Amino acid sequence: MITRYLVVFGASVTQFTVIGILFSYGVFFKELEIEFGWSRTILSSCTAIAFLSMGIFAIIAGRLTDKYGPSIVLGIAGVLFGLGFALISQISEPWHLFVIFGLFIGIGLSTHDVATLSTIAHWFPKGRGLITAIVKVGTAFGQMLLPLIAAFLILNFDWSVATIIIGISAVFLLLFSALTVKLPKKISLDKNQENNTGMAFSVASKTTTFKKLCLIQFLFFPTLMTIPTHIAVHGTDLGMTQTKAAFLLSMIGAASIVGRLAVGLFLDKMGGKKSYLFCFIPILLSLAIFMVTTNHLLIFIFVALYGFAHGALFVVVPPTLAEYFGLRDHASLFGIIVFCGTIGGAIGPILAGMAFDLMGTYKIAFATLFILVVLSSVVVLTLPNRNNSIFNKQGA
């Protein structure tokens, strides 16, 4: 029998695998630069294409999850994701990467949050923030461990063999997790009517609050996608070895564990609005330091601070959406928010790569991200307080 704690474990494995592998791609930048002579604009464009594809497919994935359940959606997406990463070993032209990231990687990314976190919201009507945080700790462990594993494989084999090993391993892990992530039986749902209540998609998607949540995601998400994509290669630019630079990604993952659990523990009490603002402060401090320092120790310290908030923000969004609109069409609404975020997330890494290619520095990129997070904070301040959720006031 599938228990809700097995669902949590399976969802965590999905997070560990998908996001950990995505983070590890940054470790391959130098190898691909040396092998093919491609610019960082090209290499970062791949992740940008994946994010955009993720957003488009997330809308579809949300609808399919609400209709058919998460298992089949996660299973198909997981196989495509793993095979896609393995296919990187066969590339010889930039368009090969674009196709792989646009289809295989993008489809895999589109389901890892929408299908898992919406399912968790149904299983845990109480303590939703903390359980979401526990699931997202899987992401943190992936961010922490898989870049180091990728660096180890590159050093002991080569980059192409590393992609094959990682990709095939991903297929098995994601198929396992797909078998465990299932919705509660109807009997379980009937015991808690909250799981059956909430705004319909057609109503919620037209509200001002929902549009603000989409805008907030669009404005802050470029930072969450750009820093993991470029921070390792930024470290090598500052004189770090490849292994030391890979530890920057692992540092984000390790710190994000603390961030996810800390915010998850208090999210249900603070509410989404305060939680957003709590997360934006350390991100702004970190971006400010990245603009001005070349000191390795300072980089590591503020990468850790950034990682705390990076992890926490991924915990904030799904429960906040449920706070305002309930669970009736949670996956479908979440898919729209993910889409809005990935539009910004797709733009961020490309512009950062272009800025580096033109200026030889990431300072302009860090400054732009800083401004976007400030704007996102302003929009958060206009959100209604938590007592204006759909359970207290229709038409949020």
What are these regions (language model features)?
Residues 25-29, 208-261:
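Extracytoplasmic gate region of multi-pass secondary transporters
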Residues 32, 111-124, 312-325:
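Intracellular juxtamembrane helix-capping segments at the cytosolic ends
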Residues 56-94, 267, 273:
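Conserved MFS/SLC helix-loop-helix module at the cytosolic interface between two early adjacent transmembrane helices
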Residues 96-110, 218, 298-311:
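Hydrophobic core of transmembrane alpha-helices in multi-pass small-molecule transporters
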Residues 134, 138-182:
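Helix-loop-helix hairpin linking two adjacent transmembrane segments in secondary transporters
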Residues 163-179, 364-381:
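Symmetry-related core transmembrane helices of the 12-TM Major Facilitator Superfamily/SLC fold
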Residues 182-199, 390-394:
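Flexible cytoplasmic inter-helical loops of multi-pass small-molecule transporters
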Residues 252-256, 262, 267-320:
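C-terminal transmembrane helical hairpin of 12-TM major facilitator-type secondary transporters
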